[in-house]
Structure formats: structure tokens, C-alpha cells
Amino acid sequence: MSPLLQRMAQHPQLDISTVYCRLRGAKAGIDPEFGAKIQWDIPLLDGYPWVEIPNKGTDSEGFWGLYNPGLWRFVRQGNFDAVFCHTGYIRASFWITYLASKFSRSAFLFGTDATTLTPLDRRMWKRPVKRLFWPFLYRLASQVIAPSSGTWDLLRSLGIPEERISLIPYVVDNDWWKAQSAQVDRNAVRDSWGVDPDTAVVLFCAKLQPWKRPLDLVQAFAQAGVANSLLLLAGDGPLKEELQAETMRLGISNRVRFLGFVNQTQLPALYTAADVMVLPSQYDAFGVVVNEAILCGCAVVASNSVGAGRDLIAPIDPSFIYPCGDVGALSTLLRGILSDRPYLSKFRVAAGERMKTWSPREHIAATLEAVERGVSRIRPLS
């Protein structure tokens, strides 16, 4: 998010103030999903104005986990045309911000990245509750934000009018990823993995969590049986030992490397030196690793539960999307694409072209349009 905020801070039509309810992720700390202490190796707080409002809450994942009463004064005294809220509605701070915006006659923009009503924790009773509550919730917004086509369709299915929804694409800093990739010595990186330039390298880059379904990929890779191939698993998490045991059971441990947590500045080398990245998640609202990999010239295969598949992969080749959990389908897909290197090269080129219109430029333009719509709705021209 920080590269976008930096660009917005420099945009002549925007005057932004960024508020953090807490700095988790921006500073070193334990990431429970990685199961380790994480310190990102790029600056996340430079190049744009920001302030942290003290959190008086419990810092848990519940409603009172984020309770920042100072938001009321900040919004009320800020004289903002619009307030763009990224804090979820299950937090107290969301409602403080909403009420402060309403009393200030500031447009209030918020949205979701969900593409389905099915919750990540699979507690299915939440589906009918969301179906009843969300139409009311999103009508509170001056403009509703959708970062993908899948989210757009979900909001429309809930009865949110088309003119109340703005598609603001989920993007990364395209220029940075392409520039970093251009500096990578692909053969040298492969040498560090102990493989030659002709080895077919498959990459998994995500937390080793059950909903990311890395076991599907390990099993599909084994079934594919592609000669001279290597599977890289970049990431950490609670499934690591189970995955290592599975590679032993399948007899492929000599063709699988566990890289652990890989920091931001090291990722371009991974993507650039791999042939294809696979994201087998059972739920990924979008999955910006898809953006990153494509920008580094890596082909991408994803399950049909990955939001980025529809916007970034399907326009190039819908056959690179397979049914989530279907190990046989993924195995067949891997066997086919890894044996057709010329087509993989064509896919990379076409995907790179697609990213030219899915970039920070489009994101900021869509943000401006959404703000203008929201402001005009609460302050109509006389």
C-alpha cells in the first residue's frame, strides 16, 4: 500500500492524510500466520504524511481490538472532503470513523475484497447473516469500493446499484517490480538452487497455512512427474513439517526446496528465475503475488478461488485456472504447460501486456473518480 500512498501524496489533485489505528506489519513483530518475527526490508512509512491514533482497545481480532477514540476528533477537525476507510466493519474504529464522517458531512468510502459470502473459517451460519446485513451495510457508504471483478459481482448480487460501486484495481508498484526483475541474473539464481537453465521450476509463494493449500501443489507436482523439474516453497507457517513429511512419503524430497520466509527485496529474484508460480488457495480475495510474479516474467497458475485469476490470468488463458482442490486437474495442467516452454513464453509476454492497464495509474484514477462520486452524492451541486 505504501507505494500507492507515496504516489497519491504527489498527485496534484489529492491532498491526503493517512491514519493508522496501529502499526502492526509496518514495524517488526510476530506474524501469527508465518509463525515467526517478521521485519519487512522495505520502508512502509516513508514518502507520505501519516499519523498513528492511539489504540485504546484490546489489540485482539475482536470488535474492541481496534478502538481509537481519537479518530473522532481527527475526522471532525480535518475538514476532509472524503474519508476512505480500510478498517473492517467488525471493528469499533470503523463505526467511530463512520459517525465522525457523517457529522462532518464528509463522503465516507469503504468496501470489501470478498468475492464470496463463504467465510474463511467455514462457519456457514455466517452466509445468511451476511446476505441480510451486507446490503444494509454497504448502503451506508457514499461510494462502495471493489478491488476486483469478483467483488463487483458479489456487491451487485446483493442489490448494490452499479453507480454506487467503484472498481479500484488491486495493484502493486509495477515499475518497482519490473525494474528489480531486470537486474536479476536468472542463471546465477538457478545456480544457487543447484539447477541448470533448462530445469522446469515451479514456485509456491505464500504462507504455509491450510487455506493456501500447499499440500495440493506438492501432491500435484509429484503426480505430474515432469523430468528435470524442481518445486520451490517460499514461505513459512504451521504446515511446514507436514509438507516436508509429505515430500518424503511421495519420494520427491530431492526435487523440493523449502526456502522459508522470503523478504520483499528477495522476491523479484524468485519470480524471475522460476518458470511458473502456482497459487492453489481455497480463499484468496485477490492475491497480489499474482501481480508480482507476472511483472517479473513468471507465468501463473491459480485455483478458481483466487480473485486475481479472473482479472489477470483468465484474459490471457482461462485454462491456467483449475478447480480448487482438484489435485488431478492441477497435475495435468502442470504436465502440459511445463512441456511447452514456447507457449509459456507467449503467456508471459501477453500477461505483461495485461499489467499495463492494471497499474497504480488506473488505481489512482479510479480512486479520484470514486471520491468525486461520493462527494457529489452528499454535497450535490446546486
Q: What name fits each language-model region?
A:
Residues 299-303:
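Short hydrophobic beta-strand element within catalytic cores of glycosyltransferases
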Residues 150, 171:
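Carbohydrate-associated surface elements
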Residues 92, 107-109, 116-140:
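Nucleotide-sugar donor phosphate/pyrophosphate-binding loop at the beta->alpha transition
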Residues 191, 255, 336, 343-357:
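A short, well-ordered alpha-helix in the C-terminal region of glycosyltransferases
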Residues 196-212, 218-221:
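Conserved donor-binding/catalytic core segment of Leloir-type glycosyltransferases
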Residues 315-327, 336-341:
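Conserved acidic donor-binding segment of nucleotide-sugar-dependent glycosyltransferases
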Residues 261-262, 269-274:
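Short alpha-helical donor nucleotide-sugar binding micro-motif in glycosyltransferases
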Residues 282:
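Aromatic "clamp/platform" in nucleotide-sugar-dependent glycosyltransferases that forms part
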